[in-house]
């Protein structure tokens, strides 16, 4: 058992204060040490969103190339697929997959807003108010939701960090997909691409692909791996980690919706089963690799946005409001505090939401 001279309160447990080393010492020295200095979270949000838009255009061009390179359906038949043999073909089920994605998009926006309210409560800003108070509606949308059993993450800036993690994972997956679909052309299994239409205006088709997320454009042959599965799995991972902090029911609901979406994709012959399985694995692995960090995205990814001449500053302003203040306790004082909390829990059946939220924000005052 490692014994530290002092501790700080932190959601994962007792750890040495991360700000024990001054920022100047932490990032001074060699060129690479300076490059590892984290960018401001607001800068990361803006720049990674710009990068995502650029990647979307790259993918749109890749879809254009893939459409032209797709094997002739009259000559090359679809590949054998065990999923096609096990699941009965139901034409048009891909529409329900799009509905699942739309539902999860709305739920993710709602969850992100609830995370923002948790952040406001953590820093002491309180709940916002609507110009006109509507009974029930204001309480539902503007009240703070916190599932204490599933909350193991620092609440300050949690909404910003969650968005950075989501958008960087999505951009990485789409960029890799742009390479994969161009490299190997597979015969299309769905009915819509058995007689693929000719693209008359490539530029217009690329723009429509970006604006409608592929829904209003022409593209066939983009099989390995499934873009629909990527966004379904991203929403699944987002709610499995962050949605569970807001309400326990988000995990089972999103899991059922995502699995139904996978079924719709295979049953409609929109993608091969391998397209779905590979997309699930890559999305989960990427989301875990990006991780949740108080500094935002991993420093290796931040290197790609440092060169942008706009959209935010490259250095953090060390102000009193932005600098976390660590609350340190000696081990004897910490044991005494734990005893007091245990006594309250036995006497009153638990601690209040305010106290629980205070200890989730315990690293800040």
From Swiss-Prot:
Q: What cellular-component terms does GO give this entry?
A: endoplasmic reticulum membrane; Golgi apparatus; Golgi membrane; membrane; plasma membrane
Q: Which residues lie on this side of the membrane: Lumenal?
A: 66-92, 187-229, 273-275
**Which residues are the active-site ones?**
228, 271, 275
What Pfam family is a match for this entry? PAP2_C
Q: What InterPro entries does the annotation carry?
A: Sphingomyelin_synth-like (IPR045221), Sphingomyelin_synth-like_dom (IPR025749)
Keyword Lipid metabolism in annotation: yes
GO BP term (any one): ceramide biosynthetic process
Q: Which reaction does it catalyse?
A: an N-acylsphing-4-enine + a 1,2-diacyl-sn-glycero-3-phosphocholine = a sphingomyelin + a 1,2-diacyl-sn-glycerol
Q: What is its EC number?
A: 2.7.8.27
What subcellular locations does the record give?
Golgi apparatus membrane
Superkingdom of the source species: Eukaryota
| The keyword Lipid metabolism is annotated on this UniProt entry | yes
Enumerate the transmembrane spans.
Answer: 45-65, 93-113, 166-186, 230-250, 252-272, 276-296
Q: How does it sit in the membrane?
A: Multi-pass membrane protein
- Which family is it part of? Belongs to the sphingomyelin synthase family.
**PANTHER family from the entry?**
SPHINGOMYELIN SYNTHASE-RELATED PROTEIN 1, SPHINGOMYELIN SYNTHETASE
Role description: Bidirectional lipid cholinephosphotransferase capable of converting phosphatidylcholine (PC) and ceramide to sphingomyelin (SM) and diacylglycerol (DAG) and vice versa. Direction is dependent on the relative concentrations of DAG and ceramide as phosphocholine acceptors. Directly and specifically recognizes the choline head group on the substrate. Also requires two fatty chains on the choline-P donor molecule in order to be recognized efficiently as a substrate. Does not function strictly as a SM synthase.
What name is this protein filed under?
Phosphatidylcholine:ceramide cholinephosphotransferase 4
Q: Which organism is it from?
A: Trypanosoma brucei brucei (strain 927/4 GUTat10.1)
Q: Which gene encodes it?
A: SLS4
């Amino acid at each position: 058992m490692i014994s530290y001279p002092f501790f700080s309160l932190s959601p994962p447990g007792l750890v040495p204060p991360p700000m024990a080393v001054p920022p100047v010492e932490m990032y001074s020295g060699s060129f690479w040490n300076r490059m590892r200095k984290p960018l401001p979270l607001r800068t990361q949000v803006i720049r990674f969103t710009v990068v995502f838009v650029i990647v979307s255009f790259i993918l749109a061009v890749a879809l254009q190339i893939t459409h032209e390179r797709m094997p002739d359906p009259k000559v090359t038949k679809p590949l054998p697929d065990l999923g096609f043999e096990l699941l009965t073909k139901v034409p048009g089920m891909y529409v329900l997959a799009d509905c699942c994605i739309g539902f999860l998009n709305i739920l993710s926006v709602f969850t992100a807003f609830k995370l923002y309210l948790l952040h406001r409560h953590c820093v002491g800003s309180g709940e916002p108010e609507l110009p006109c108070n509507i009974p029930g509606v204001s309480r539902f949308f503007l009240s703070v939701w916190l599932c204490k059993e599933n909350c193991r993450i620092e609440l300050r800036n949690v909404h910003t960090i969650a968005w950075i993690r989501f958008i960087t994972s999505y951009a990485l997956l789409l960029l890799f997909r742009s390479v994969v679909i161009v490299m190997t052309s597979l015969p299309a299994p769905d009915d819509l691409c058995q007689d693929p239409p000719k693209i008359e205006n490539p530029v217009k088709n690329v723009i429509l692909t970006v604006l409608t997320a592929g829904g209003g454009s022409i593209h066939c042959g983009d099989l390995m791996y499934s873009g629909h599965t990527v966004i379904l799995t991203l929403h699944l991972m987002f709610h499995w980690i962050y949605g569970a902090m807001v309400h326990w029911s988000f995990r089972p609901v999103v899991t059922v919706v995502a699995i139904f979406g996978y079924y719709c994709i295979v049953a409609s012959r929109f993608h091969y089963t391998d397209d779905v399985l590979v997309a699930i694995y890559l999305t989960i692995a990427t989301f875990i690799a990006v991780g949740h960090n108080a500094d935002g995205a991993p420093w290796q990814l931040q290197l790609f946005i440092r060169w942008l001449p706009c959209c935010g500053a490259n250095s953090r302003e060390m102000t009193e409001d932005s600098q976390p203040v660590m609350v340190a306790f000696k081990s004897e004082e910490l044991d005494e505090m734990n005893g007091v909390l245990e006594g309250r829990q036995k006497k009153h059946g638990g601690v209040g939401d305010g106290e629980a939220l205070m200890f989730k924000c315990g690293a800040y005052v």
